[in-house]
């Protein structure tokens, strides 16, 4: 039941939050409640302000309308930041994507990793992330906080079958890149074509890409360890791997425009 609506409460003098509103905000830490209400929670003045330009604010809690104890009750953080905002979730349209570089996530489950990836995409000018249903919820409080406001500029789309979507884009001429141990060293000049459009697929933290998604990869890439032939860590954190791949793609963009 929606009990918090935008009103004069959020302009000028703010009315003190009711117990029902405080309980409602606290309930939004659970995905089923966020989905039922179509909202999510952000914390911290900067994050709330950044998101305010792209998402509709439903409720705001701060020192003007809630006590320190009440802020702590609503917060999901160990150290509450004094400002909490509840925003409406955005309805995204996958068909609105133009020909550009896209990131796809195949079952990235850790909220911290997803938040890092969203923030990294924002840094490298990636505006769209297509996610499998098994990927963590982008409106999870941990994800929202990790993005540091990047959700206002990066759009996420959750799809029933990622392999089907990849196949559709491949038929439109999009190269599909995937990080695989049997891939081509991505630092080889020919590994990354000069096309501006494409989809970079990153896999699950423990299992990598699913078999179905792997079949759609047209350009398997390897992030090589150093030095070659010497035992190193088994794999990279998916957030770090995403940053390395995007940095190389953007470096190639720069070289190709010189």
Which ranges hold each PLM region?
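Amphipathic alpha-helical repeat scaffolds
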Residues: 44, 110-117, 140, 233-241
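Active-site/ligand-binding-proximal alpha/beta "capping" segment
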Residues: 178-233
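RNA substrate-binding interface of SAM-dependent RNA methyltransferases
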Residues: 3, 96-183
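Short pre-catalytic strand/loop immediately N-terminal to key active-site residues, enriched for Gly-Thr
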Residues: 38, 105-109, 227-234
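Short beta->alpha connector loops at strand-helix junctions that form conserved
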Residues: 66, 106, 132-133, 155, ...
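Glycine/small-residue-rich loop that forms an oxyanion/phosphate-binding "nest" at active or ligand-binding sites
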Residues: 66-88
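Boundary-proximal intrinsically disordered activation/regulatory segments immediately upstream
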Residues: 2-61, 135-136
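Structured adenosyl-cofactor binding patch, chiefly the S-adenosyl-L-methionine
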Residues: 123, 138, 145-150, 211-258
């Amino acid at each position: 039941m929606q009990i918090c609506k935008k009103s004069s409460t959020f302009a000028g003098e703010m009315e003190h939050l009711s117990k029902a509103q405080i309980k409602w905000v606290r309930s939004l830490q659970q995905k089923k409640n966020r989905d039922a209400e179509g909202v999510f929670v952000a914390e911290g003045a900067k994050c709330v302000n950044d998101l305010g330009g792209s998402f509709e604010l439903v409720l705001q809690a701060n020192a003007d309308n809630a006590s320190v104890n009440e802020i702590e009750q609503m917060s999901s953080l160990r150290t509450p930041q004094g400002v909490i905002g509840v925003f409406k979730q955005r309805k995204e349209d996958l068909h609105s994507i133009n020909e550009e570089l896209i990131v796809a996530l195949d079952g990235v489950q850790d909220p911290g990793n997803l938040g890092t990836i969203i923030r990294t995409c924002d840094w490298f000018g990636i505006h769209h992330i297509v996610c499998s249903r098994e990927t963590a919820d982008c409106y999870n409080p941990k994800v929202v906080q990790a993005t540091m406001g990047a959700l206002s500029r990066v759009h996420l789309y959750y799809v029933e079958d990622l392999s089907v979507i990849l196949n559709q884009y491949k038929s439109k001429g999009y190269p599909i890149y995937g990080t695989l141990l049997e891939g081509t060293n991505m630092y080889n000049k020919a590994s990354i074509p000069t096309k501006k459009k494409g989809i970079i697929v990153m896999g699950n933290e423990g299992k990598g890409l699913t078999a179905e998604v792997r079949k759609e990869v047209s350009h398997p890439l390897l992030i090589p360890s150093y030095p070659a032939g010497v035992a190193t860590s088994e794999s990279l954190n998916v957030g770090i791997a995403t940053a390395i791949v995007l940095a190389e793609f953007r470096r190639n963009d720069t070289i190709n425009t010189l």
